[in-house]
């Protein structure tokens, strides 16, 4: 199974599928359609039914039930796009057999080294087969590892008809990394009672809580005048932007928070004297705290509007997704089945909140409760991203075991 997974995964990551928030089309980039069409062909070749891609880049397929029991239809999902944080073009995966626990030189010329000194969890992978980057791109394990694992699990179930299961639906979605993954997802057509995203990190991750999330875009309009004659006339929008940021709690940023703590994150700032634009994301697990954070942002803007004028500072704030716990707790048995599946395989479930979001965050509010399970990847979204093939095999086994458990408990 290891060779199958390596072959699939290394093929997928070589297709540039980085999404693009500045584009309104779905999918936002053509590479996502390229990979989607490849996946449809592969789904058909392994024997999946109804494999197709729609005009928006959503791939769906079915593995029919092979049991006489009345088993709920379950789904497994992964996303085809990679993050905007770091380039995903010309990915050149490196395979490290039987990792020795020492530094891994990713790129000698650029002096890029993946070291246990910087990433202590790396030491725990001694003896594993690892796949890394070449130090110039991200890897794309988020979320092409999930695609490879779902594909391999379906292939395994088809080749082992003695394993009884209900109907299984599979979907590969576009534009998850820019928050649009489920926007055009047809829940009715998918027709599953429950689903799992295979979009987590290290071995054993099982998540059914996500942030409540909002984005805030602020435009500040200044007044540029020659600095030699600027007294009483110039309004420096960049300085107002600095002032705005100072009105937010300095210690409530991603670099200072963990666990259930929320934050304000200044994603980008672009500007000059005449105009400055700030892009924040706001995150919190607790609904009331989430509302309070948005109010804090509004008050900061209003304070500056009162000082500089209503029309000089414009706030565009909108909710992105909500904590899926509220929709999953009423059907907590789907989390318990995944937990049991891991325990049956000798894997310790690590149930923790996602300090982020998945497609499941939105899908759960669209009527498809969708917790998240691990892929085996580490250090997503950058050149130090890597994944254990050994743990990818375990993710495949968990998918198969979840299918078995739903049938056994029906």
Curated annotation (Swiss-Prot):
Keyword field contains Metal-binding: yes
Database matches in InterPro entries: ArgE/DapE_CS, Bact_exopeptidase_dim_dom, Peptidase_M20, Peptidase_M20_dimer, Peptidase_M20B
Catalytic reaction equation(s): Release of the N-terminal residue from a tripeptide
GO terms assigned for molecular function: metallopeptidase activity; tripeptide aminopeptidase activity; zinc ion binding
Cofactor(s) essential for the protein: Zn(2+)
Family: Belongs to the peptidase M20B family.
Role summary: Cleaves the N-terminal amino acid of tripeptides.
Protein name from the UniProt record: Peptidase T
Organism from which the protein derives: Bacillus subtilis (strain 168)
